[in-house]
Amino acid sequence: MTEHHYDWSGGPAVIKQHSIAKHNVLRAYLARYFITLGCSPNQDVLKLTLVDGFAGGGEYTHSDTKQLVLGSPFICLDAVREAEFALNANRHKPLKLDVHCYFIEKERPAFLYLERALRDRGYGHQIGAEIHLRRANFHDEAENIIDAIRARNPRAGRSIFILDQYGYKNVPFSLIRKIFATLPGAEVVLTFNVDSLLTYVSDGDVTQEMLSNLELNGAFCGRTIEEIKKSERDWRLFIQSGLYRELIQRCGAKHYTPFFIRSPQGHGDYWLVHMSQHHRARDVMTEVHWEIQNHFIHYGGSGLEMFEITGYDPDYDSLAIGQHRLGFEFDDVARKQSIRTLKEQFPRYIYARPDGLSFGELFASTCNGSPASAEIYRSALIALVEERVIEVVSEDGAVRRSASQIRNTDCVRPPAQRSLLIT
């Protein structure tokens, strides 16, 4: 993961705490990803391709602690090694992780530093085999990489594209659409510096041309920027909400979840958007977000459906600042808030389907508009069961009484005697 101002010419580049949050999300997600995919005892091989489109030099120095910090290439490689050990610890039938990694970096100092760091850390023998180094723009290499993934894994094309661009212009949405259209098993983790875009957004011709080139010109539903600024109290959040919805629509993913990361300067939000074609992948990433988040933003305004987003703000990181915030655990507060919101939304959705729907269908059809994980969904449903607003039953008719009992195939439906409060 690299930004243009990082400098590897004299050693590891300097990295700030808010950027390390991206590394933490990636590390935690890869660990869960391998556990999820490698759980079948009958598997022999797990094929996967990891693509780091903006790899950087692989090593950083923390701006505050001065400690050495590993970048995304080594996070990927370490995740593979650790997963292979963990997955085979209690297996009778060995599982081989057949993972290829593509590390693309256009800047010469960063590329040379990464190549040297890989050799110094014992990965030299894999370069040209499982590790593919490319000194190039990601956009120029993407077609060849997509073809190589499809050749290795024709049916699913299982892969994760880590696209930590600087700014918002280096990854065309048309390219992301092609990834999903060509590789059904692909996932994309995209960095999008929304505040950098907001700095320049206006009603001028230059901005409108830029939005058109980014395929974001429909984000504001025909309203001008001047009109939005005059009529919306939180106009920045209102504009971000429109941009996010347009971004998701243009990328072509069925399932997605955003995570914001805030720089210490106040604004400076950028998004880490995970996109996939399967709701299970989305849920795994959401679980990671709930592990790492320490802040919450309500996006939206008049004329837009409200949605919420978890995120990371270094000012709220007790480990980073060395102070504990007594009496306040954000995770518990945000979790309770999400359960309350779901309890308000679920009844009308469920009552509109008199025959009910499966839990899996409920989650898959609504999860994109909520920061909640499947576990939080289950907790909200059980709260409604206890209040006799709904009922959850298994395929054989067993009534579910606790969140841990709910399975994807269970039917969520109105009770035989409906509440008069639902209209």
Map each language-model feature to its residues.
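Class I SAM-dependent methyltransferase Rossmann-like catalytic core
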Residues: 2-45, 65-66
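Short amphipathic alpha-helix with an adjacent loop that forms part of the alpha/beta core around
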Residues: 142-154, 177
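A conserved mid-domain beta-alpha-beta active-site/ligand-binding segment of alpha/beta enzyme cores
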Residues: 206-264
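A short, conserved alpha-helix within the catalytic core of class I
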Residues: 168-178
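Conserved beta strand-loop-helix elements of the APE1-like EEP
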Residues: 271-282
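SAM cofactor-binding core of SAM-dependent methyltransferases
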Residues: 31-145, 372-379, 383
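C-terminal target-recognition/interaction regions appended to catalytic cores
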Residues: 287-423
